[in-house]
Amino acid sequence: FRDALPQISRIPAPKPGFKKYEDGRLRPDGKPGFNTLSGKLDFFSDRAAKFGYPGLPEYKPMTVLSKEFDLRLMNGSRKPYITHSKTRTDQPYLMEIEDCLHVNINPRDAEARGIKEGDTILITSPYGGPVEAKAVVSLIVPVGTIDAQYGWLDNQNTQKLMNRGNRDPLSGYPSYFENPVRIEKKA
């Protein structure tokens, strides 16, 4: 093995164990406690409050679905062989494994829309679309939800379905898991 990879080096793994907070394995300074300003579990963030954000998490209800957009899109699932569009489209072998966007849809939702495994579907949201994908009928997603990979381009790019105005105020992260959409079988 070392002959095949002469540049490889070993890095010792951290010692496994329980109660790492007791002996300083959670903090860069080696002191006992948690890796927070106080060294304790912080339920209220003084740092967030200092900058005018809520010190405690606030519940916000999800975007309400409508008759027209009656499914919720979870955008951002990943497959180990497709990380970003660059790694996929530059690799013919990866395109042989999966050559287009696949979207998981619950069997009940698929049946209600006349969609079968492998059908080409169009996804539209109040913010954009349509996005073209192949249907994967699966119990992996609950009723009322579809699940799409990210990283596809052009007419398969799910980013155009996102609500750009609905972001977490502290991190700026978009609401990738609650966008209302509708799907239909492509004619």
Where are the model-predicted features located?
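Long, contiguous, secondary-structure-rich segments that constitute the structural scaffold
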Residues: F1-I11, R88-N104, R108-A187
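Long, low-complexity segments enriched in small/aliphatic residues
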Residues: F1-Q91
